[in-house]
A protein has these predicted regions:
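Internal, hydrophobic cores of structured domains that mediate oligomerization or house catalytic pockets
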Residues: 66-190, 315
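Long, positively charged binding patches that form subdomain-scale interaction surfaces
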Residues: 170-294
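Short acidic-glycine loop/turn motifs at beta-strand connectors
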Residues: 306-309
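An N-terminal, globular interaction/scaffold subdomain
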Residues: 2-122
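Short, surface-exposed coil-to-beta transition loops
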Residues: 295-302
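Generic detector of well-ordered alpha-helical segments enriched in charged/polar residues
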Residues: 10, 19-23, 45, 49, ...
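Short, solvent-exposed aromatic-acidic interface loops
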Residues: 317-321
Length: 321
């Protein structure tokens, strides 16, 4: 139901009265925090936050995340409407415009990573990522999807369009495969925990052996429709596996996947020196995908094998939206 207040706020936006809208956002959020707590307050004020993040000049929009309004007024990294407010902002302005304005470190980092996903090269002039995640997409990160599919496409008055990336996307190019006996599960692998954190709606296992043995641990049948893909074509769905609710953005997925790849490669650097090791891992990795007949609308069935260390990780999950 559209209320008088909605019409009033829309009229203020149409007139470019953004300071008044920011004040309304802050007052509404602070009052809701006092009345009901942080989470309900964030949900209540998110539509107005989306409007400001999408349409206001960047000098004002970044103030959604500033603490100068007082307790309860600040949008956090989890505040979202159709998607995180910081991601809405990041899709609207270049890093050159936003870098001098953004202060909070968590928001700043996620906005920078979003701009990287959208094709910006921040490897010169931007502060290094605290975990050493590169500020320029590797060729294998960019190859498997169009720029428009990497981040939600937000709409001015709320809502967003997003690509639903799944593995396998179809049966095309796959064939009948008889999986071998499943390998023995290995526990305590940091890479396994990192992959589980990436896709917390899926099951993750690690085995010593090739990718099909890892797949056999989670596949519902020893006879599957499956095949191999280059990692560049697997990468987009792995990034999007982390974006399962509106409070998370594609930057979360890229950061989580890089953590997993660093662990799989056995790299230890946090200053970007591990990129060569990750690139080498990606070049040698064998990725086996398989189809499950009961797959939900969102599904991920892939096994990632590193032949250099003889380990393989399977990630398998399915859910309806």
């Amino acid at each position: 139901m559209i209320t008088y207040e909605d019409h009033r706020l829309r009229a203020l936006a149409d007139d470019g009265r953004w300071p008044e809208l920011l004040t309304a956002y802050r007052q509404g959020r602070a009052a809701a925090v006092e009345r009901a707590g942080e989470e309900p307050a964030a949900a209540l004020t998110a539509p107005l936050g989306h409007l400001i993040a999408y349409s206001a000049p960047p000098e004002l929009a970044v103030r959604l995340f500033d603490r100068d309004g007082g307790p309860g007024t600040v949008a956090g990294v989890a505040d979202h409407d159709a998607g995180p407010l910081w991601e809405v902002l990041a899709t609207r302005h270049s890093w050159l415009r936003l870098a001098p304005l953004l202060v909070p470190a968590p928001v700043r980092r996620l906005v920078a990573q979003t701009r990287v996903l959208l094709g910006e090269d921040l490897s010169y002039g931007a502060e290094p990522d605290p975990e050493g995640v590169p500020l320029l997409l590797a060729p294998w990160e960019a190859a498997g999807w169009d720029e428009g599919a990497r981040v939600r496409q937000y709409l001015p008055c709320g809502g967003a369009r997003s690509a639903l990336l799944t593995l396998p996307a179809s049966r095309e190019g796959l064939g009948d495969v008889t999986l071998p006996a499943s390998g023995v599960r290995l526990g305590g692998q940091r890479a396994t925990r990192a992959l589980a954190a990436l896709a917390d709606w899926a099951e993750v296992v690690c085995v010593r052996g090739p990718a099909p043995q890892a797949a056999a641990q989670l596949a519902r049948s020893s006879r599957v429709t499956g095949g191999y893909l280059p990692f560049a074509l697997v990468y987009p769905a792995l990034v999007q596996a982390a974006v399962v609710d509106r409070g998370r953005g594609s930057a979360h997925g890229r950061l989580a996947l890089w953590r997993a790849l660093v662990e799989m490669a056995g790299a230890k650097g946090t200053d970007g020196s591990d990129r060569a090791e990750v690139d080498a891992l990606v070049a040698r990795m064998r990725c086996f995908i398989w189809h499950e007949p009961t797959a939900g609308l969102r599904h991920l069935h892939v096994a990632l094998e590193d032949p250099a260390c003889g380990l393989a990780w399977a990630v398998s999950g399915s859910e309806d939206l």
